[in-house]
Amino acid sequence: MKLKPFLPILISGAVFIVFLLLPASWFTGLVNEKTVEDNRTSLTDQVLKGTLIQDKLYESNKYYPIYGSSELGKDDPFNPAIALNKHNANKKAFLLGAGGSTDLINAVELASQYDKLKGKKLTFIISPQWFTNHGLTNQNFDARMSQTQINQMFQQKNMSTELKRRYAQRLLQFPHVHNKEYLKSYAKNPKETKDSYISGFKENQLIKIEAIKSLFAMDKSPLEHVKPATKPDASWDEMKQKAVEIGKADTTSNKFGIRDQYWKLIQESKRKVRRDYEFNVNSPEFQDLELLVKTMRAAGADVQYVSIPSNGVWYDHIGIDKERRQAVYKKIHSTVVDNGGKIYDMTDKDYEKYVISDAVHIGWKGWVYMDEQIAKHMKGEPQPEVDKPKN
């Protein structure tokens, strides 16, 4: 029997077996300071669902993490990763968030770094459209939740057993969550829970794959082509003025202050816009926000929460009135401050032009307002606009 035709298969099989047997420590060195710098605005799954890049991020003092959701990937020249520079900030912004990254997704992501968070400064952007009738959907949970981050969260030595137990209980509410037996055991009796959330062998393979994908990432940053709209040493007032100019030029097709490109999509759909499931003051999302805030306080992180508004003119038009929105805004605010967080509340600006770029995404002038508070928070400057915790 001739082996030559089978050599490629045999070689591939041998390489695969060797890969399985090699320790993850041989690969983690692929993720270094340059990898972190290269991924500041990448918003890839290796950043958002992995642990290696975020491990390095929190070992460094060069970066200021900004957590949120889909607004972080919008091509706006006033996005903090574009607008903040050495003239107005003392650290580089690092973006973490994508569509579907709501409170629980971000809470687990942050909790997986719990032991590194003490004294670390970061901003967490809260979007009002998260607070729906159903909260985090099963679909978004399946797409955005990370097994390796859950596993690393349960390995955090300084995180209390009670906090971990609360996460186990919440995770069990999702039908497709991995390793329900482990979570059930931890939720019932943490001290008797053995093994780990994922096996050592599986963890080893996932970390190796993550390291390789981080090194050879092919996806381009959604902000790669975006350039600053003002000179590097522009004042905040100059930036706001320019933001208004750009916002005005980008919203000529409608009376709602919605970006022309997005307005065209609304017109083309020819369907009545229904958002009745949003702005629910009894949304389960509030419990996830409370868990996140309590986790960050227990970890000793210096978090600036930012509550952004919606487009008030548009939401009035589609039947979700100011009173309903204000009730949710107020509860977001109280959930943060009553649980030990400080908040920059922008929700009084939901009728201000060029703060929101479509229905819900912050843009233009809204970003500049936030950029200024982020820069102040970075540098430890006074922030009279920020409400402090009540306890």
Swiss-Prot record:
Keywords: Cell membrane, Membrane, Signal-anchor, Transmembrane, Transmembrane helix. Signal peptide: none annotated. The chain crosses the membrane at residues 6-26. It is a single-pass type II membrane protein. One of its GO terms (cellular component) is plasma membrane. Its main location: membrane. GO terms for biological process: lipoteichoic acid biosynthetic process; symbiont-mediated evasion of recognition by host antimicrobial peptide. Residues 1-5 are cytoplasmic. Residues 27-391 are extracellular. Pathway: Cell wall biogenesis; lipoteichoic acid biosynthesis. It is found in: Cell membrane. Pfam families: DltD (PF04914). InterPro entries: DltD, LTA_DltD. The keyword Membrane applies. It comes from the Bacteria. Belongs to the DltD family. Involved in the D-alanylation of lipoteichoic acid (LTA). Could be responsible for the transfer of DltC-carried D-alanyl groups to cell membrane phosphatidylglycerol (PG), or alternatively of D-alanine residues from D-Ala-undecaprenol phosphate to the poly(glycerophosphate) chains of LTA. D-alanylation of LTA plays an important role in modulating the properties of the cell wall in Gram-positive bacteria, influencing the net charge of the cell wall. This is Protein DltD. It comes from Staphylococcus aureus (strain NCTC 8325 / PS 47).
